């Protein structure tokens, strides 16, 4: 004879008989329980709404308010910083312009002083050169006069020697010098 196995009763319980204990069908879809289900649904949503309006929504509103306040503070700080940066930039630009103007003034003053100094040196050099030129011209005139005086003597001596050789007697020295002077004024 066959002995019952410990799982034999379990297998019998697995046999499915259609919804005998519930009266047939899926309970949420039974029309007899709709009114109770709708009532519990309204109560659950009411409680959920009450909890959300008293707990969650104020927390979210507080977070949004804090965030908005932080954003406004950050925007105000950014505006203050921008104003500060603009004023610093303006001060920097004014300072830079003043420095450039001062540098231009210094450069112009330096150019003017160098030009005046160069002009003074040029005038001194021109005066020195004019003095040296006048001295040189005086020396040239003196040497030319000395040389011309020597030429006159040499020419007179040569003319006297030539005439003496040609005619055999020495001509008058004053006449020879007068003849030389006449030939020099013609040229």
UniProtKB/Swiss-Prot annotation:
Subcellular location: Cell inner membrane
Transmembrane intervals: 32-52
One term under GO cellular component: plasma membrane
Molecular function (Gene Ontology), one example: proton-transporting ATPase activity, rotational mechanism
Family affiliation: Belongs to the ATPase B chain family.
Role this protein plays: F(1)F(0) ATP synthase produces ATP from ADP in the presence of a proton or sodium gradient. F-type ATPases consist of two structural domains, F(1) containing the extramembraneous catalytic core and F(0) containing the membrane proton channel, linked together by a central stalk and a peripheral stalk. During catalysis, ATP synthesis in the catalytic domain of F(1) is coupled via a rotary mechanism of the central stalk subunits to proton translocation.
NCBIfam families the UniProt entry points to: PRK09174.1 (NF006612)
Subunit: F-type ATPases have 2 components, F(1) - the catalytic core - and F(0) - the membrane proton channel. F(1) has five subunits: alpha(3), beta(3), gamma(1), delta(1), epsilon(1). F(0) has three main subunits: a(1), b(2) and c(10-14). The alpha and beta chains form an alternating ring which encloses part of the gamma chain. F(1) is attached to F(0) by a central stalk formed by the gamma and epsilon chains, while a peripheral stalk is formed by the delta and b chains.
Lineage: Bacteria, Pseudomonadati, Pseudomonadota, Alphaproteobacteria, Hyphomicrobiales
InterPro entries referenced in this protein's UniProt entry, alphabetically: ATP_synth_b/b'su_bac/chlpt (IPR002146), ATP_synthase_B_chain (IPR050059)
Chief place of localization: membrane
UniProt membrane topology term: Single-pass membrane protein
Protein's name in the database: ATP synthase subunit b 2
Keywords: ATP synthesis, Cell inner membrane, Cell membrane, CF(0), Hydrogen ion transport, Ion transport, Membrane, Transmembrane, Transmembrane helix, Transport
């Amino acid at each position: 004879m066959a002995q019952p196995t410990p799982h034999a009763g379990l297998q019998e319980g697995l046999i499915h008989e259609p919804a005998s204990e519930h009266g047939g069908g899926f309970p949420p879809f039974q029309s007899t329980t709709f009114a109770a289900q709708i009532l519990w649904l309204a109560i659950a949503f009411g409680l959920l709404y009450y909890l959300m309006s008293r707990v969650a929504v104020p927390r979210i509103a507080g977070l949004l308010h804090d965030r908005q306040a932080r954003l406004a503070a950050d925007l105000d700080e950014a505006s203050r910083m921008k104003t500060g940066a603009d004023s610093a930039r303006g001060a920097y630009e004014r300072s830079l312009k003043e420095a450039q103007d001062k540098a231009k003034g210094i450069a112009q003053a330096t150019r003017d002083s160098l030009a005046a100094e160069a002009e003074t040196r040029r005038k001194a050099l021109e005066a020195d050169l004019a003095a040296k030129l006048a001295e040189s011209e005086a020396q040239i005139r003196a040497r030319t006069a000395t040389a011309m005086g020597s030429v006159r003597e040499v020419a007179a001596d040569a003319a006297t020697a030539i005439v003496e050789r040609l005619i055999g007697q020495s001509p008058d020295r004053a006449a020879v010098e007068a003849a030389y002077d006449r030939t020099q004024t013609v040229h």
